[in-house]
């Protein structure tokens, strides 16, 4: 995820401001992420900012506004960590930290039939993908990759510990392929991690003390530079 620059400066926008045409890719359609809305006024099409933050490019033709909010609004294909709060005949109702409870169909898993569908209990954690997000409907989840149909890491999260209340921007940084914090921790400690775009992170390691150390590092390193994160992690690991 790259920060978009305009005239050599990082682009910070406020609600109501228009994204300049010079920044918008003219090659094909554009995918708008959180914080951006499409408007059409007097035959003119424009992209307008709906919340304050920095403009980031998440792909060739994709962009979003990255803010330090903790309020999660579901978006299609977001990876989220949810908790089962109730069961019904066809599936589960899942808390993903948004204004609406999400639904997870019991057949929305890899290679599942009605006879082999998973049996999730109330309180269980799941790593899922948002398959439907509409402001007038409850979000829908799936536990498989949309392109391959494989689990690809989605499904029930067993054991471990879930961190909640992280800023959404912090989670976006954690999910990057080369994240300094997670790379530093991983070079010293083996662990499993699932990062949700809804401000939640699940961590599992060989013992409780190591899991607590990793969770502490994730919570405390949000505003540190790469060098500070490396030093902080090394100091924590010495205490094990």
UniProtKB/Swiss-Prot annotation:
SUPFAM superfamilies: Eukaryotic type KH-domain (KH-domain type I), Nucleic acid-binding proteins. One of its GO terms (molecular function) is RNA binding. One of its GO terms (biological process) is poly(A)-dependent snoRNA 3'-end processing. PANTHER family: EXOSOME COMPLEX COMPONENT RRP40 (PTHR21321:SF1), PNAS-3 RELATED (PTHR21321). One of its GO terms (cellular component) is nucleolus. The keyword Lipid metabolism does not apply. Pfam families: KH_6 (PF15985), Rrp40_N (PF18311), RRP40_S1 (PF21262). Belongs to the RRP40 family. Keywords: Cytoplasm, Exosome, Nucleus, RNA-binding, rRNA processing. Non-catalytic component of the RNA exosome complex which has 3'->5' exoribonuclease activity and participates in a multitude of cellular RNA processing and degradation events. In the nucleus, the RNA exosome complex is involved in proper maturation of stable RNA species such as rRNA, snRNA and snoRNA, in the elimination of RNA processing by-products and non-coding 'pervasive' transcripts, such as antisense RNA species and cryptic unstable transcripts (CUTs), and of mRNAs with processing defects, thereby limiting or excluding their export to the cytoplasm. Residues 75-144 form the S1 motif domain. CDD domains: KH-I_Rrp40 (cd22526), S1_Rrp40 (cd05790). This is Exosome complex component rrp40. The keyword Acetylation does not apply. Component of the RNA exosome complex. Specifically part of the catalytically inactive RNA exosome core complex (Exo-9) which may associate with the catalytic subunits rrp6 and dis3 in cytoplasmic- and nuclear-specific RNA exosome complex forms. Exo-9 is formed by a hexameric base ring of RNase PH domain-containing subunits and a cap ring consisting of csl4, rrp4 and rrp40. Its main location: cytoplasm. It is found in: Cytoplasm; Nucleus, Nucleolus.
